[in-house]
């Protein structure tokens, strides 16, 4: 396994859950990490933890659904940390419920963050990642897009969320085909049920539905997903892990 010494990673949605755990894991592997989210107080606390463990962190408060803000995140990372080798597109939102009475603004939020925000960050980062693949000691770079089992299996009540995650999968594989021969690896990580804040943005009746669906199940921890991401980006140059599907042992779908 290669280390990430001398590299820089940018992690979106880093204020909690998978993003927070991933930033800590990448920093522990040697990367300088730019942590991006809207909740600056949480990012500041995360940066303190990274630096207390001997790492380097850059806090960027931003909403990546704004294309200009997403681009500015990337440019600030390169300006202050010197380069960009790894992009982890983790920011996302899951808003579930039957189609019949669904608030349309929830669809807009999911499309804007889960799809467009991810694309904005990728578009801004790509020139820097291509450069890193040419001039870094690793001679490769990585884009890791966090999807979901919902990008493979559709369920009643989650149609728009499914659509965004199926879309992330299609975008990721198309991009992979474009850049793989230039040694930018594109990986899709698809978690099942994870104990994070993700479901907490839903309406009370939806939260009850989710609780019943996973009642008694030992869910994944954010660190389980962070371990998988770190594994992906620390493979030797000739190894590209294009997909990781990771569920709790007891989860059927």
Which residue stretches match the model-derived regions?
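Conserved glycine-rich cofactor-binding loop
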Residues: 15-16
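Conserved glycine-rich Rossmann-like NAD(P)H-binding loop of the short-chain dehydrogenase/reductase
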Residues: 31-46
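The beta1-alpha1 cofactor-binding region of Rossmann-like NAD(H)/NADP(H)-dependent oxidoreductases
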Residues: 40-41, 61-73, 104
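Active-site helix of classical SDR
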Residues: 122, 164
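C-terminal helical subdomain
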Residues: 188-189, 196, 208-253
